[in-house]
């Protein structure tokens, strides 16, 4: 007995493809996402002479932007991605931040070390320090710098066993934060009200020392003073030690942001 089989014509261009064949359409999707196409045997675009990937049409530039965006999302700071230095008010020192960013970009162009490696941004609560540094990071990621954002307490939590996100190992967490061209370490000592544990001191000093040795820039924000005073909250040196304070003050620029608490309601809540 024979069985009749229906046959259908195949439209040209829609023929079945060999298993695991990567089509041009798939490559374009991966390219837009900033994937490393060299893993698929696709030749990489030539490295720019100045070492900077700035054009968003270039996959590497989109990859740099994705690194920054993902770090902001991990910090639940999606809303801060809209800020640029031109949006800041004079109290947030946009011109100083822009000049420092220019120096970082110029250093990478000439494959050298920035003259000022650390930017320390202290100030009272709610003055817009995080907003200012987010604007700095937004523009840095668009100017060819590998830029990451992380809160100090979050970094320490990620360095603990089984504490890292996305199935990363602890050494991978350290690697990604040590190797960034610009690291924004937000709320330094933000959840510490006394002498830090040996773990916190060791991990923080290791991060800062490694970045200094590699010539990579770090911006710190904090609500604390460098040192505490009688009857006042402890300062950075009181919590992490004089050795750490000397590390971040070396080759540093101070940008103090003071002013009213921007998050405080204009009318006090009665409750």
Ranges and model annotations:
Residues 1-99, 254, 263-271:
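A short, basic N-terminal segment
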Residues 87-119:
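Pre-Walker A (pre-P-loop) alpha-helix and adjacent loop at the N terminus of AAA/AAA+ ATPase modules
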Residues 97-101, 137, 141-179, 198:
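Short glycine-rich substrate-engagement loop in P-loop NTPases that contacts/grips substrate
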Residues 112-133:
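Walker A/P-loop nucleotide-binding motif
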Residues 145-146, 179-182, 214-220:
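Loop/turn-to-beta-strand initiation segments
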């Amino acid at each position: 007995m024979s069985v009749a089989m229906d046959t259908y014509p195949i439209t040209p261009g829609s023929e079945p493809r060999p298993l695991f064949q990567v089509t041009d359409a798939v490559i374009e999707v991966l390219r837009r996402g900033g994937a490393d196409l060299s893993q698929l045997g696709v030749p990489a675009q030539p490295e720019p002479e100045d070492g900077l990937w700035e054009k968003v049409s270039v996959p590497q530039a989109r990859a740099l932007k994705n690194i920054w965006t993902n770090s902001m999302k991990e910090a639940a700071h999606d809303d801060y991605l809209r800020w640029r230095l031109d949006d800041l008010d004079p109290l947030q020192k946009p011109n100083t931040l822009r000049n420092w960013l220019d120096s970082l970009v110029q250093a990478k162009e000439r494959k050298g070390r920035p003259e000022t490696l650390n930017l320390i941004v202290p100030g009272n609560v709610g003055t817009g320090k995080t907003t200012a540094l987010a604007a700095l990071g937004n523009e840095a990621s668009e100017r060819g710098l590998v830029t990451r954002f992380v809160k100090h307490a979050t970094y320490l939590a990620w360095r603990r066993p089984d504490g890292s996100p996305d199935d990363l190992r602890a050494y991978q967490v350290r690697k990604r934060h040590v190797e960034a061209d610009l690291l924004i370490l937000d709320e330094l000592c933000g959840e510490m009200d006394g002498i830090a544990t040996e773990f916190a001191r060791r991990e923080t000093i290791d991060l800062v020392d490694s970045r200094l040795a590699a010539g990579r820039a770090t911006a710190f924000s904090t609500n604390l003073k460098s040192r505490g005073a009688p009857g006042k909250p402890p300062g950075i040196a009181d919590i992490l030690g004089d050795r750490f304070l000397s590390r971040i003050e070396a080759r540093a620029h101070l940008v103090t942001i003071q002013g009213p608490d921007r998050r405080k309601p204009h009318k006090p809540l009665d409750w």
